[in-house]
Amino acid sequence: MANIKSAKKRVKQTVVRNERNTAQRSMLRTAVKKVIKALSIKDIAGAETAFAVAQPILDRFSSRGLIHKNKAARHKSRLTARIKALKTA
């Protein structure tokens, strides 16, 4: 356990940030899963609306450093490709 006052404060900050990041990462995963679920049942409209919700979440969290920018780009690219493939099929 920390003895110095500033170290105690840092421990508190770490706990708060960890909880916030965990919740936000969970929200991100849920948004992506909704798109994938809509794609699996071949619901084009549902997939597009879910993707419209997930895309800004990916952008926001990548700019904050919660996920890497390449991971966000990869998710967006792959989901877009799957939606496009479903439309043409």
From Swiss-Prot:
InterPro entries the UniProt entry points to: Ribosomal_bS20, Ribosomal_bS20_sf
Keywords of this entry: Ribonucleoprotein, Ribosomal protein, RNA-binding, rRNA-binding
GO terms for biological process, alphabetical: translation
Record keyword RNA-binding present: yes
Segments of this protein annotated with the region Disordered: 1-20
Compositionally biased spans, kind Basic residues: 1-12
GO cellular component, one term: cytosol
Single GO term (MF): structural constituent of ribosome
Known function: Binds directly to 16S ribosomal RNA.
Family: Belongs to the bacterial ribosomal protein bS20 family.
NCBIfam families: S20
HAMAP family from the UniProt entry: Ribosomal_bS20
Name of the protein in its database record: Small ribosomal subunit protein bS20
Organism: Xylella fastidiosa (strain Temecula1 / ATCC 700964)
